[in-house]
Amino acid sequence: MSTEPEFEIPDDGRDSEAPTEQDDDAALDAYSQIVIRVAESVTPHVAAIEMTSARRNGQLRVGSGSAVVFTGDGYMLTNAHVVAGIQSGRAVFANGKQTDVELVGADPLSDLAVVRGLKPTPPPAILGNADSLRVGQLVIAVGNPLGLAGSVTAGVVSGLGRSIPVRAGEHRRVIEDVIQTDAALNPGNSGGALADTRGRIVGINTAIAGLGLGLAVPINRTTQRIIASLLKDGRVRRAYLGLVSTPIPLDASAVVRTGQKEGLRVVEVIAGSPAELSGLQPGDLVLRAQGRAVSSAESLQKLLFAEAIGEPFPLTVLRDGKTVQLIAVPSEMSQQ
């Protein structure tokens, strides 16, 4: 006759009463407590949005994504690609409340857009500053992937300063300082929140670049300007120079003479553009613009907002080993 094996459960020194809620809280590790706290704080401010837009063949296309309430009167941040061609839309919140939304403005070159709820919405989320993020820092993504409302994933900042090439009409640009994270993102997360451990929104989730790799547009001083322009004008006015460039390191002698380690090599100057009219030539090495050092396309783009349109735009370039001063007058970039 076989006998069942006997197992002795060691005494943990506590009585056998059922665990209390306080016991459960104490058992949670610090990581879980942070994620839970941020999820509970951020989720009410994030909406699932459904958008209806027209295809070229006249048929209607229904898309979905996420949006984040960021003002007390119902304005929400999302991605420009989520609301492209929108005819109508609806936002649904975690508490079950719904509202129709209207498009306020979109900027394809930053992949940011603003929509407004036509009925009362939950209070706004708190916006943070992505410039304070560090690689390895914990971040929490809240969105509506695959139609699953209020989904939360957590990960770390895998990289900072990444760039996403984007195109709007005939213009190409890069979204600068993009946040790379390993927090799981899926279709429907676009437009959702990326929050830090204090529940502040530091990014708007925008793309899935591959398995285990998500990207978010940062919330920082540059994007705050974009958001302000969308609220005010429904679009972002940008200045246009008309050049194609690539960053290169300076040789040792140039570093000594200029005090810079990098510059922008001009690859192409567009015919008839402000850059050509200024005298800029292919092969020139741009060192400074408006008196500020430039070492990447992003650093130059940051200077080309509406206030630069039609105004003198000083350029310092290195040409054949000599420093040359040029003055360009940027025009307004067309929206087409």
Per-region residue spans from a language model:
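Serine-dependent protease modules
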Residues: S2-E262, F305, G321, E332-Q336
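A structural signal for short, hydrophobic beta-strand segments that form beta-sheets
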Residues: L103, V157, V266-V269, V286
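Short, structured beta-strand/loop micro-motifs enriched in basic residues and often containing a Trp
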Residues: K119-P124, L264-I270, A293-A297
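Residues at or immediately preceding the N-termini of alpha-helices
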Residues: A130, N220, G272-P274, A297
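PDZ/PDZ-like domain micro-motif
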Residues: S190-A193, P249-R257, I270-R288, L303
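PDZ-domain C-terminal substructure recognizer with occasional recognition of PDZ-binding tails
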Residues: A228-R235, R265, L277-Q281, L287-A293, ...
